[in-house]
């Protein structure tokens, strides 16, 4: 994970340079940053989406055009403001899965999966939704996944997909810091990502399937608070008001609630 640490240092340097001079940010070379699996593994992991969606227990809800537009707008804003590391030409696909447990995960090629329970019970403000989503955008585009054995079963359950996309703690910690910078550069309130971590930590029983080991999330919150303090962020304990969300976000919530 030394390469991810290198990336974070480069972002800090790049941010300082962009603020102190008119230097073109494209002169900073981010090529090769991130720990990437082999292309064959990336292709196999990306293709697992088909096996997951084909599994009889995987039930998706139909996304309305305005929901898709809203999700694509967030994606475009995140990516377009971070083109040193993210590719705007890669178009996303979104799936909302009917499931009683809260979870989200991504696969390579900008494929994103959210559970209905996560959106309805926990991501009730737009800033929180964007914060959780941003980490998966980073992972998907930079291929930040652990290499695991993938048996050709022809189907994958939700539990298996979460296992396939789970990260080691040290990697996850660095992705969290990476996500902070991506949110900040896109003009979002990056402190919302701390709230997303805290939500998981306060509801470990509900997030048991997603987290696996619930002990790590407390450490994750502690380390991210320290990281934010080092960034000069004051008042890290902040709540995000649902009322501040856009009309388009409420359309997403309505789409999920209607299950149509």
Where are these regions (language model features)?
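Sec-dependent bacterial lipoprotein signal peptides
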Residues: 1-17
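C-terminal capping/extension segments of zinc metalloprotease domains
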Residues: 19-49, 54, 63, 81-89, ...
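Active-site metal-coordination segments of metallo-dependent hydrolases
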Residues: 60-69, 159-177
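Zn2+-dependent metallopeptidase catalytic core
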Residues: 68-86
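Catalytic zinc-binding patch centered on the HExxH motif and its immediate surroundings
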Residues: 94-110
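Short alpha-helical catalytic segment bearing the HExxH-like zincin motif
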Residues: 113-114, 128-136
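Catalytic Zn2+-binding segment of zinc metalloproteases
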Residues: 122-127, 136-153, 187
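Active-site His/Glu-centered metal-binding helix of metallohydrolases
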Residues: 132-142, 174, 178
């Amino acid at each position: 994970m030394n390469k991810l640490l290198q990336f974070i240092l480069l972002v800090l340097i790049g941010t300082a340079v962009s603020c102190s001079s008119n230097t073109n940010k494209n002169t900073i070379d981010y090529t090769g940053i991130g720990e990437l699996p082999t292309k064959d593994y990336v292709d196999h992991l990306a293709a697992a989406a088909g096996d997951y969606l084909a599994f009889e227990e995987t039930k998706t809800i139909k996304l309305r055009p305005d929901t898709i537009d809203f999700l694509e707008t967030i994606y475009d804003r995140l990516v377009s403001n971070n083109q040193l590391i993210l590719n705007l030409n890669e178009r996303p696909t979104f799936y909302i899965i009917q499931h009683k447990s809260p979870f989200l995960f991504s696969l390579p090629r900008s494929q994103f999966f959210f559970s209905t329970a996560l959106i309805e019970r926990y991501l009730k403000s737009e800033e929180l939704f964007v914060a959780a989503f941003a980490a998966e955008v980073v992972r998907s585009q930079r291929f930040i996944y652990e290499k695991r054995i993938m048996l050709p079963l022809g189907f994958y359950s939700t539990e298996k997909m979460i296992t396939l996309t789970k990260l080691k703690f040290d990697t996850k910690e660095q992705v969290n810091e990476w996500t902070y910078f991506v949110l900040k550069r896109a003009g979002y309130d990056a402190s919302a990502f701390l709230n997303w971590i805290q939500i998981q930590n306060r509801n470990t029983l509900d997030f048991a399937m997603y987290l696996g080991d619930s002990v790590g999330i407390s450490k994750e919150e502690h380390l991210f608070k320290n990281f934010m303090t080092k960034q000069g962020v004051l008042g890290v304990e902040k709540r995000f008001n649902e009322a501040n969300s856009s009309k388009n976000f409420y359309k997403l919530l309505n789409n999920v609630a209607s299950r149509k």
